[in-house]
């Protein structure tokens, strides 16, 4: 009988995966009480493998959805395809229906061929606990031709892979055998434990296959048509015990030849090789057998608990007695581990050397690596001395002859083009000034009790031992502004210094190229969420290039500013239940404890954390800010009782009353517990362990107030805050904000909203106009007559955002750095004013009258939307 592994030309090999081309044509879902037009896609999974799960693009339709999209999959003839039709919504995806395809049934129904086979699948969905019809899905399958003779048909298996059975005197075969070797499938004779390209290993066997490895200590007779010449030979050896698997191993995973497998005509005779292999030059005590090859005579030892076995067709597999599993692949050397990366690719971890590799390690590979490592260690010391042969003498000489002594820790002196400069490895910055003399030459002494110190980053500060306080401000007269030092002095200069330090960190960690984000104004939230979360966090540090679908604007910074403004207004909208207003009269935002009503709320908080970090990293403003206690949480600072007054005045007044009154005289029975209600569910929280049994007294009242204040700021929002900070930290490390306080962080994120008209006029420039032009005078007259809301709309119309930098209009940022507000004479009097948000420029036509200019300007800022190109 032909072996199952035989193949013909044009027929898929039975033991290899093949490519299947699946064309998703259309779907007719049954839509009940939903929107008439739905946005959906199809997800296809092969055998439930994440690496073989692919999706189609999104399509919008009503009664019928058309894709006509081709997906290429790696399958076997016994694979199962799971197809799911999803409907996309803003906050979640909804399953419209599922269907499954058994490829073995399709092959049998079509004579082993799949040539543009059309299938109309019935979608099923769940409705109130019952499975109902969800419509139809039409697909085409185009795959290889398969020999149906190699496909297991239930109870029968091919002769070439007939498994042995246990002896009648042995233990009965259980449904799950002790050692189940890899099984055969219709693409031929391999179990799902062998490696697939881009996939993961599976140990499940088909229901129609029996275990050829269900042997414990007694081996069974095996018939093999390919070994008929050895039918009269017998092996008079003892069976191999399970505790000695290393004596029957072979090198690698290469199958033994037919001569290594002796078959007896006696059913009770052991037929597989046992305890040991013949030594070199020694003949085995069998009749009709041949000597084993050299590779099998000098085997590498298997790990403890492993055993090598052989199928009747000569194929070798390995039994792990520790986990009671089998595999085709030889076990890894000690200290190695097999893992899968997010793309489904296998790699191998060497815990001995803490390294990884794509190549599967073998005994020879490990020996070669150890030999190379030994040679490398011998040469490493010599190479290190060789590379530092000049550095040691020069450094010692410079130290000996330098009157200022050694540099501070973390500093290095270098020379470029004849000029000396200094490198601060603590902050990864360079400077021309010598840190040993900077700020010390010709400076008066500090006042009594004061001391100058430096942080680990090289920033100096001053310690007042009289009051036990520290400050960045120089206490010496004439040094308040820090003009001689360059370090932060007074508060206004201190914030500028902190801001420039932060911008320096952002620029020094920026990545080249740009990242494109394509969104639609109608689905801004969903589009931005999908694209930002699908990107690597470090890619979000690249220069942003925002594309508004249907608009032809080129983003040189202006579209990005508007995108940050619009998206922040959308994601921080309390209607999504992710955030809530801090109070009735306080429109700052805080995390909503009831956000868990959305099952994916933690993913959205992670997205918002990334978005806020992007705004700070790229120097853009958002529309609405958070509460000051939330900024303190970002800075890892502890909120105080005074911070509670702005977000919950009633709770604050209650705590103040407790603090100012004697609880024992009032007869209040308070304990270290507090109740909280979320979505109608009341839960009790202990402020400290065993708090329900600890009564609040005058002695422990301060501790109670402190714990109660901390609980009020964190109640019900611990998970949400952690997800937000994790997302933020992925883009910009929170350590970069350590110099700021909560008010400075709010100012840097939200900017200033109050508009100073004199500052605006003072820092405006004109093109093809002059300051005395009548159109310019009319323009400023219109702006002065506007209220603050319309002025903000005008500012947003021209710059893309309604917020101002800390320095006001003098520090407006354009595409290439600072760019002031500009008014240009462009167009005819019938045109509307236009803006170039990337350059902070307003195109103002030469209108004939004040009324005409006012009408056109107000119409432009209130009724226009979108970008275009001239």
From Swiss-Prot:
Modification Phosphoserine occurs at: 211
Native species: Mus musculus (Mouse)
Protein name: NEDD4-like E3 ubiquitin-protein ligase WWP2
Reactions this protein catalyses: S-ubiquitinyl-[E2 ubiquitin-conjugating enzyme]-L-cysteine + [acceptor protein]-L-lysine = [E2 ubiquitin-conjugating enzyme]-L-cysteine + N(6)-ubiquitinyl-[acceptor protein]-L-lysine
Pfam families named in the record: HECT, WW
Skewed-composition ranges (Polar residues): 152-171, 222-235, 262-289
Described function: E3 ubiquitin-protein ligase which accepts ubiquitin from an E2 ubiquitin-conjugating enzyme in the form of a thioester and then directly transfers the ubiquitin to targeted substrates. Polyubiquitinates POU5F1 by 'Lys-63'-linked conjugation and promotes it to proteasomal degradation; regulates POU5F1 protein level during differentiation of embryonal carcinoma cells (ECCs) but not in undifferentiated ECCs and embryonic stem cells (ESCs). Ubiquitinates EGR2 and promotes it to proteasomal degradation; in T-cells the ubiquitination inhibits activation-induced cell death.
Gene: Wwp2
Organism taxonomic ancestry: Eukaryota, Metazoa, Chordata, Craniata, Vertebrata
Summary of activators and inhibitors of this protein: Activated by NDFIP1- and NDFIP2-binding.
Compartments in which it is found: Nucleus
Molecular function GO labels: potassium channel inhibitor activity; RNA polymerase II-specific DNA-binding transcription factor binding; transcription regulator inhibitor activity; transmembrane transporter binding; ubiquitin protein ligase activity; ubiquitin-protein transferase activity
């Amino acid at each position: 009988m032909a072996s199952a592994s035989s193949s013909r030309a044009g027929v898929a090999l039975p033991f290899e995966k093949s490519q299947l081309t699946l064309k998703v044509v259309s779907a007719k879902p049954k839509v009940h009480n939903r929107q008439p037009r739905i946005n959906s896609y199809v997800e296809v999974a092969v055998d439930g493998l994440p690496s073989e799960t692919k999706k189609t693009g999104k399509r919008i339709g009503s009664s019928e959805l058309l894709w006509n999209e081709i997906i290429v999959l790696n399958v076997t003839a016994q694979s199962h395809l799971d197809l799911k039709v999803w409907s996309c919504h803003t906050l979640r995806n909804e399953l419209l229906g599922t269907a499954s395809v058994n490829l073995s049934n399709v092959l049998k129904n079509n004579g082993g061929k799949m040539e543009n086979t059309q299938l109309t699948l019935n979608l099923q969905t769940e409705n109130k606990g019952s499975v109902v019809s969800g419509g139809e899905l039409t697909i085409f399958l185009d795959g290889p031709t398969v020999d149906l003779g190699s496909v297991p048909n239930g109870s029968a298996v091919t002769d070439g892979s007939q498994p042995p059975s246990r002896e009648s005197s042995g233990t009965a075969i259980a449904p799950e055998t002790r050692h189940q070797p890899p099984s055969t499938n219709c693409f031929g004779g391999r179990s799902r434990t062998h490696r697939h390209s881009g996939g993961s290993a599976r140990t499940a066997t088909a229901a129609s296959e029996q275990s050829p490895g269900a042997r414990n200590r007694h081996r069974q007779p095996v018939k093999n048509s390919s070994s008929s010449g050895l039918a009269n030979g017998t092996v008079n050896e003892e069976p191999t015990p399970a505790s000695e698997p290393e004596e029957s191993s072979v090198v690698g995973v290469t199958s033994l030849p037919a001569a290594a497998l002796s078959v007896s005509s006696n059913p009770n005779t052991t037929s597989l090789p046992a305890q040991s292999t013949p030594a070199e030059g020694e003949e085995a005590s069998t009749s009709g057998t041949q000597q084993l090859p050299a590779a099998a005579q000098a085997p590498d030892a298997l790990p403890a608990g492993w055993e090598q076995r052989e199928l009747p067709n000569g194929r070798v597999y390995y039994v792990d007695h520790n986990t009671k599993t089998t595999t085709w692949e030889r076990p890894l050397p000690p200290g190695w581990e097999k893992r899968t990366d997010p793309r489904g690719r296998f790699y191998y971890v060497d815990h001995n050397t803490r390294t990884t590799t794509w190549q599967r390690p073998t005994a020879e590979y490990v020996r070669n690596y150890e030999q190379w490592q030994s040679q490398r260690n011998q040469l490493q010391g010599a190479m290190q001395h060789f590379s530092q042969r000049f550095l040691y003498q020069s450094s010692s000489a410079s130290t000996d002859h330098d009157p200022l002594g050694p540099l501070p820790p973390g500093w290095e002196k270098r020379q470029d083009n004849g000029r000396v400069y200094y490198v601060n490895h603590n902050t990864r910055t360079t400077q021309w000034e010598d840190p040993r003399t900077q700020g010390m030459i010709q400076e008066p002494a500090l006042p009594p009790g004061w001391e100058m110190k430096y942080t680990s980053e090289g920033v100096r500060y001053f310690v007042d031992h009289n009051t036990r306080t520290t400050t960045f401000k120089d206490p010496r007269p004439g040094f308040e502004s820090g003009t001689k030092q360059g370090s932060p002095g007074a508060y206004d200069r201190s914030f500028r210094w902190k801001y420039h330090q932060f911008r320096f960190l952002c620029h020094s960690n920026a990545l080249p190229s740009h990242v494109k984000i394509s969104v639609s104004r109608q689905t801004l939230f969903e589009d931005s969420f999908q694209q930002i979360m699908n990107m690597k966090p470090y890619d979000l540090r690249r220069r942003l290039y925002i594309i508004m679908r249907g608009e032809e604007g080129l983003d040189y910074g202006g579209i990005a500013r508007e995108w940050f403004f619009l998206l922040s207004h959308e994601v921080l909208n309390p209607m999504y239940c992710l955030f809530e207003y801090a109070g009735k009269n306080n429109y700052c935002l805080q995390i909503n404890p009831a956000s868990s009503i959305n099952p994916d709320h933690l993913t959205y908080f992670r997205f918002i954390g990334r978005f806020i970090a992007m705004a700070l990293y790229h120097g853009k403003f958002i529309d609405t800010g958070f509460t000051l206690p939330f900024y303190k949480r970002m800075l890892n600072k502890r909120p105080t009782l005074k911070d509670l007054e702005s977000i919950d005045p009633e709770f604050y007044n209650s705590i103040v009353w407790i603090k100012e009154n004697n609880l024992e005289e009032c007869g209040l029975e308070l304990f270290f517990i507090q109740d909280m209600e979320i979505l109608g569910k009341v839960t009790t929280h202990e402020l400290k362990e065993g708090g329900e049994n600890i009564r609040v007294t005058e002695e422990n009242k301060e501790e109670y107030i402190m714990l109660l204040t901390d609980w009020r700021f964190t109640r019900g929002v611990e998970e949400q805050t952690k997800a937000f900070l994790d997302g933020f930290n992925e883009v910009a490390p929170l350590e970069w904000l350590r110099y700021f306080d909560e008010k400075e962080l709010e100012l840097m994120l939200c900017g200033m909203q109050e508009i100073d008209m004199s500052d605006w006029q003072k820092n405006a420039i004109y093109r093809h106009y002059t300051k005395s032009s009548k159109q310019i005078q009319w323009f400023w007259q219109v702006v002065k007559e506007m209220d603050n809301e319309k002025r903000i709309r005008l500012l947003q119309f021209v710059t893309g955002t309604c917020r101002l930098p800390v320095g006001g209009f003098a520090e407006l940022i354009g595409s290439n750095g600072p760019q002031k507000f500009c008014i240009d004479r462009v167009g005819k009097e019938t045109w509307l004013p236009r803006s170039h948000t990337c350059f902070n420029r307003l195109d103002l036509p030469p209108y004939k009258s004040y009324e005409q200019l006012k009408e056109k300007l107000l119409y432009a800022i209130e009724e226009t939307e979108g970008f275009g190109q001239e």
